[in-house]
Amino acid sequence: MSNRSRRQVRLSRALGIALTPKAQRIFEKRPYAPGEHGRTRRRAESDYAVRLREKQRLRAQYGISEKQLRAAYEKGTHTAGQTGNAMLTDLETRLDALVLRAGIARTTAQARQFVVHRHILVDGNIVDRPSYRVKPGQTIQVKPKSQTMVPFQIAAEGTHRDVLPPVPGYLDVNLASLKATLTRKPEPEEIPVQVNIQYVVEFYAR
């Protein structure tokens, strides 16, 4: 297991969620926090600790920095409707998130790598910013020259679908063509992340 994989497994156990397929397998065997006292019952947590952990869980699932998550919160406070729902919808339209949801990548880290290495097109143009927000109607696709690479051939066979959640309703995916279209704005209840978003809002609003 690589150092990165080991860190992801440890973080998964600490946060109580599986962040990668490998972490999922290990988490099923050892569903408790890492360390000498991981099996023991947690002490009663403060309200602050509970909300901090939810914020960390959301950050980890999208693989983003504290600055990026706070920016999503600030944007949500200026959006009509509930701040938490606006945050989730905004984060879910990140390019790296949609590359993962489509099954083109196996993990968030791999999705980000594909984008940064200029393998991903949006409406035919290379976009190398994982934080790029995809708009409804836009299509993401693996660059034709990259489609012969082994990772993308594996994805085109649908291999990652066995370890990822079902494709959400806001994506129209053609894996054989390594292509996906965001058909509409994601609804918070259909976004496949594990988080109490209200706790995250309360953490930042304190």
Swiss-Prot record:
Tell me the SMART domains matching this sequence.
Answer: Ribosomal_S4, S4
Gene3D superfamilies registered for this protein in UniProt: Ribosomal Protein S4 Delta 41, Chain A, domain 1, RNA-binding S4 domain
Question: Is Coiled coil among the key words of this record?
Answer: no
User: Domain S4 RNA-binding spans what residues?
Assistant: 93-153
GO biological process terms held by the UniProt record: ribosomal small subunit biogenesis; translation
Q: At the top level of its lineage, which domain of life is listed? A: Bacteria
TM segment ranges: none
Q: InterPro entries annotated for this entry?
A: Ribosomal_uS4 (IPR022801), Ribosomal_uS4_bac-type (IPR005709), Ribosomal_uS4_CS (IPR018079), Ribosomal_uS4_N (IPR001912), S4_RNA-bd (IPR002942), S4_RNA-bd_sf (IPR036986)
Mind listing the GO molecular function terms for this protein?
rRNA binding; structural constituent of ribosome
Family the entry assigns: Belongs to the universal ribosomal protein uS4 family.
**Which NCBIfam families does the UniProt record give?**
PRK05327.1, rpsD_bact
Task: State whether it acts alone or in a complex, and with which partners, per the record.
Answer: Part of the 30S ribosomal subunit. Contacts protein S5. The interaction surface between S4 and S5 is involved in control of translational fidelity.
Function according to Swiss-Prot or TrEMBL: One of the primary rRNA binding proteins, it binds directly to 16S rRNA where it nucleates assembly of the body of the 30S subunit.
Q: What PANTHER family does this protein's entry cite?
A: 30S 40S RIBOSOMAL PROTEIN, SMALL RIBOSOMAL SUBUNIT PROTEIN US4M
Q: Could you tell me what this protein is called?
A: Small ribosomal subunit protein uS4
Q: Write down the species.
A: Bifidobacterium animalis subsp. lactis (strain AD011)
